[in-house]
Amino acid sequence: MNIPHGLKNENEMPETLLALDIGTEYIKAVIAERQEGDNLIIRGVGKEHQAMGNMYAGAIADIPAVISACEKALSRAENMAGVVARTCSVGIAGELIKGNTKTVRYRRKDGNKPISDQEMQLIIKRVQDKAEEQAREEVALETDNPDVEVRLINSAIVSLSIDGYKVSNPIGFKGSELVLQFYTAFAPLVHISAIEKVCAELNLDLVAVAVEPFAVCRACLGNNLDSNLSAIVMDIGGGTTDIAVVDNGGVEGTKMFGIGGRSFTHQVASRVGLDFDTAELVKIQYSGLLSNDLHTLKTLTVSDAERMNEVQNILNVPDRMKKVEKAIADNTEVWVSGVGLALSDFSLLEALPNKILLCGGGAGLSTLQEALATSDWYEELPFARRPVIHLLDDVDIPDIQNATEIDLDYSYITAFGLLRVTVDTLNSEEEDTGLRAKLAKLLQN
């Protein structure tokens, strides 16, 4: 992609970074300027709607179509920022992303010998190899493809202890037994290859591919890797719902299931007898979001006004309104069951965090927030009390400032996290103490 006339190359400006959130419903491009202390200032954003068929279950299904949509989103972000950014991270989601936390006990031959970089690298490599084998077996079973290949995309040390003593960096310590809780996430190689192809065609320097809820956790932590944040993060997209559990600042694991905003739209379309685009507007109008989506338009066209009237007329018909309510209520019940099932897999925790942070385009659906806040879905899970639900906004994200005139709401939080992952990756490449950087709770792929 050539640099448009009037835009400066990133080499001529302060260091600029790009987050590319390739979602099922929208592609979002966010350009940020990296400041001293790794604070970030958002300079440009771009958004482009995805056509049906571009994505499947959170993964790229049509590479040329996704490239075309990315170009449009990038162009808008670059025009707003006045600079072309090439250094980027991209998010990945979907049910075939396998993120788990394992507890490993390692008995050392000589407890009086200080732990070295080389020894820790060997331990981490063994843990990653074992996790990769398990992830490959799971994906092979789900895809009925015994030859499937997977690749490590994210890993993080959740906790470390030596002879029962917790440490943040084991290098130099003596001890006989090292207990390591280690989070790893793997994705099918075909999914990662598609992302790499898109970035290559866009002439982008891809520095990291990150599991999207993992990236959101990074956004919430900001520059403070010693944070004691404990929360459940839910990224509700168009095709999937991606969940991460953070305990005392460490990522316990990630789970995904294939119900997102578009499944609600399909239900409304099927039961009310509408085309997909009209059903989408009916869904968001029902949730009180249509006016929010349209407020970004400087002028309301005749076509926009006609569509709004059409949607309101549908909801004004009692029989149709009941069908809309029933479709959304039934799908919400299934979605909540999926949330409960996903959280039941976090068996390492005695109690789940009491705070649930929502983001992603689907998080704005009021029925989902209401179901989490008022129903009894949580009672069979290890919560100490009813969890508190919070819809994330840009003001909730530390160390990132929005310098644009765009309201960067919950739907942009994943992109914020991808920017933070980019900074982490660049820092780990710049530092000579590679393992020490890894042991700062975040390990890069």
Identify the residue ranges that each predicted region occupies.
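Nucleotide/phosphate-binding catalytic cleft detector across ATP-hydrolyzing
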Residues: 1-26, 30-88, 92-231, 290-295, ...
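Short, surface-exposed connector motifs at secondary-structure boundaries
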Residues: 177-179, 247-251, 348-355
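Acidic, glycine-rich loop-and-beta core segments that form the ion-binding/anion-interacting portion
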Residues: 214, 219-291
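Short beta-alpha connecting loops at secondary-structure transitions
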Residues: 252-253, 266, 323, 399-406
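Short loop/turn motifs enriched for small/polar and acidic residues
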Residues: 90-95, 359-361, 392-394
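A short, acidic, amphipathic alpha-helical segment used as a generic capping/interface helix at domain edges
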Residues: 335-347
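Conserved phosphate-binding/catalytic loops in two-lobed NTP-binding clefts
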Residues: 113-118, 373-413
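Glycine-rich phosphate-binding loops at beta-strand->alpha-helix junctions
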Residues: 187, 288, 351-377
